Design a protein with these regions (language model features):
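AlphaC helix of the eukaryotic protein kinase fold
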Residues: 16-35
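Activation-segment/catalytic-loop signature of the eukaryotic protein kinase fold
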Residues: 47
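Conserved short submotifs of the Hanks-type protein kinase catalytic core
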Residues: 51-65
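AlphaC helix of the protein kinase catalytic domain
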Residues: 66-76
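Activation segment signature within eukaryotic-like protein kinase domains
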Residues: 84-85
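Protein kinase catalytic-loop region centered on the HRD/HxD motif
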Residues: 90-100
Length: 392
């Protein structure tokens, strides 16, 4: 469908003559997802009743669900699987911090758009923390946590278990827990461990055995305590896969960063610790790096090249090597207030806010001090420009 007023494509979910329970589910989806604004969560624009119809108007995503990529003949590269799960982790962490538990994480509820960006969908049985918990089994048996199957109150760790099941299937093309019927599946989830992931995919690094064991632990005490913890281990795994293929060795990257003004007051060990919260990316001239209005949890440090910052199509700043940008979205947790475009070919350090929170306190303190210095410099330049224009 097309929104004629805003001139954008939208998706419509329409139900006719549904029961009060189904109507409640539909509006719960709108209420749960509607309070969330995240690049990896499908946006809800509007919901309502019209005669005997219930409807939700939502973001249109051109792509397919992860179900296609969970089949043995369509498995994605390992690094792409990790990136997908990492981004879903980030989305879930965002939702959990706002009191929303999804409760039905599965491949068919995660869209993958044409650019490979995952979008978490269908909050129809989500639970909002301030609401009274309903008794009963909620979810899809093959992806439900042991505590959900026992009709206990699901928590954010229940979502982690379900995401672990999705990750297992993405990597192997096989469900973690299978059976002839739901009773067999429920028994296996509550009593048995799945086949070790490396028996099905021997090319996986050993760290994946530890990640899957913690994600699919039956005990809450042994399971990952938060999505942030899982995301951190996924970043460790990704670096282990990607670094041998990179243009530079770890030592070369550290030496490069030590020459960047932003890191002049960092020790070598502190720069090394940033490796797990960041990635080095190349951006060609003319490519948009961040877009005004986007919600994102990453910020950037320009290592080489030039970047232009635009607001309403007007250039408001030029970023040079050694300077950071995008930090206000991280600090304030709000939408991007400007766009950034590569003015030349650029080498960037892209830093994840969710993983920066796991960095040592001393490293975080240095970052905030350098952010403050950057903001002070920009304000000083801005004031100088205003003074200059007023004196003319």
């Amino acid at each position: 469908a097309r929104d004629a007023y805003i001139q954008r494509q939208v998706a419509l979910k329409i139900s006719r003559g549904i029961s009060s329970q189904s109507r409640k589910k539909l509006f719960l989806e709108a209420q749960s997802a509607g309070r969330l604004s995240n690049p990896n969560i499908l946006a809800i624009y509007d919901t309502g009743l019209y005669k005997e119809f219930c409807y939700i108007i939502m973001e249109y995503v051109e792509g397919q669900t992860l179900k296609k990529w969970c089949r043995p003949q369509h498995l994605l590269p390992i690094d792409q699987c990790i990136e997908i799960v990492f981004k879903v982790c980030s989305a879930l962490s965002y939702a959990h911090q706002r009191g929303v538990i999804h409760r039905d994480i599965k491949p068919s509820n995660i869209m993958l758009d044409k650019q490979g960006t995952p979008k978490l969908t269908d909050f129809g049985i989500a639970r909002i923390s301030e609401q009274k918990s309903e008794k009963g089994v909620w979810g899809t048996p093959s992806y439900m946590s042991p505590e959900q199957l026992k009709e206990e109150t699901g928590t954010h760790q229940s979502d982690i278990f379900s995401l672990g099941c999705v990750m297992y299937e993405l990597l192997t093309g096989q469900r973690a827990f299978t059976g002839e019927n739901d009773f067999t599946i429920i028994y296996k989830i509550t009593r048995e461990n799945p086949t070790p992931v490396r028996e099905l995919r021997p090319d996986l690094p050993k760290i994946f055995e530890d990640i899957m064991r913690k994600a699919l632990a039956k005990s809450l005490e042994e399971r990952y305590a938060s999505c942030m913890d899982l995301a951190y281990d996924l970043r460790v795994a990704l670096r282990g896969i990607m670094l041998p293929k990179g243009d530079k060795k770890v030592e070369d990257i550290i030496d490069l960063l030590r020459q960047v003004p932003f890191f002049h007051n960092f020790t070598r060990e502190q720069i090394e610790s940033l490796g797990l919260a960041s990635s080095i990316i190349k951006v060609p001239e003319g490519k948009i790096i961040v877009t005004e209005g986007d919600i994102d949890d990453t910020f950037y440090i320009l290592l080489n090249g030039k970047v232009k910052i635009r607001k309403n199509d007007t250039v408001i700043a030029k970023i040079r090597a050694g300077e950071c940008f995008g930090e206000m979205a991280y600090i304030a947790g709000k939408a991007r207030v400007a766009s950034a475009t590569a003015h030349t070919n650029c080498l960037l350090m892209k830093i994840s806010a969710i993983l920066m929170d796991k960095a040592p306190d001393a490293v975080q303190l240095l970052f905030f001090k350098n952010f403050a210095r950057t903001l002070s410099y920009r304000l000083e330049k801005s004031s100088g420009l205003e003074t200059g224009s007023n004196s003319k």
